């Protein structure tokens, strides 16, 4: 796809991930970083942060584990949780824009795992202190999207 877009001067929007900020940690993060490097100059790389939804989520994702009461521990991490509907509106904002480059797609407001678990009735779980390979905090820089008129509307704690 990148080759076609480059050869035909077609703008391409593609999914990246906040994991690129520590791209050396795992194969997924490496693959997203490679995509960003290989992307054509007139493309838009969207670094999605912690995407969630009440309706659809992988069973191994924290939000789903809290929702289904299958989580066995909590961490002290803070995550930038962004609802899938806000992802859709961010993409809809980017499509007609002339923006090119890579940008963060998140709320810019990290929420602690403990606060989320407490809201969902799971705050009683033990805290796991040792979590190698996990970032303490993820937080999107939303300035570029906000300058295009986009703002997230769904708060995970509401």
Region annotations inferred by a language model:
Residues 1, 39, 65, 144-146:
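Structural element of the ATP-grasp superfamily
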Residues 1-30, 44:
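Conserved Rossmann-fold NAD(P)-dependent oxidoreductase catalytic core, especially the SDR/UDP-sugar
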Residues 17-20, 50-56, 110:
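Active-site proximal helix/loop that lines the substrate pocket
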Residues 27-29, 33, 37-88, 92, ...:
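NAD(P)-dependent short-chain dehydrogenase/reductase
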Residues 45, 81, 110, 139-140:
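Short aromatic/basic micro-patch
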Residues 71-72, 94-105:
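Core catalytic loop region at the nicotinamide-binding pocket of NAD(P)H-dependent oxidoreductases
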Residues 74-76, 102-103, 111-118, 122-142:
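C-terminal "lid/loop" region of Rossmann-like NAD(P)-dependent oxidoreductases
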Residues 120, 155-158:
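Amphipathic terminal alpha-helices
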């Amino acid at each position: 796809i990148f080759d076609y877009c480059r050869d035909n001067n077609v703008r391409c929007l593609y999914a990246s991930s906040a994991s690129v900020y520590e791209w050396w940690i795992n194969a997924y993060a490496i693959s997203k970083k490679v995509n960003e490097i290989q992307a054509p100059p007139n493309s838009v790389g969207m670094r999605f942060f912690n995407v969630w939804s009440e309706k659809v989520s992988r069973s191994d994702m924290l939000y789903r584990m809290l929702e289904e009461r299958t989580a066995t521990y909590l961490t002290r991490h803070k995550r930038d949780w962004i609802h899938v509907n806000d992802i859709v509106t961010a993409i809809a904002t980017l499509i007609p824009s002339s923006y090119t480059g890579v940008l963060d797609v998140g709320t810019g407001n990290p929420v602690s795992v403990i606060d989320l678990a407490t809201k969902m009735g799971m705050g009683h779980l033990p805290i796991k202190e040792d979590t190698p390979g996990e970032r303490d905090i993820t937080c999107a820089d939303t300035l570029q999207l906000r300058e295009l008129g986009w703002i997230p509307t769904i708060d995970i704690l509401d």
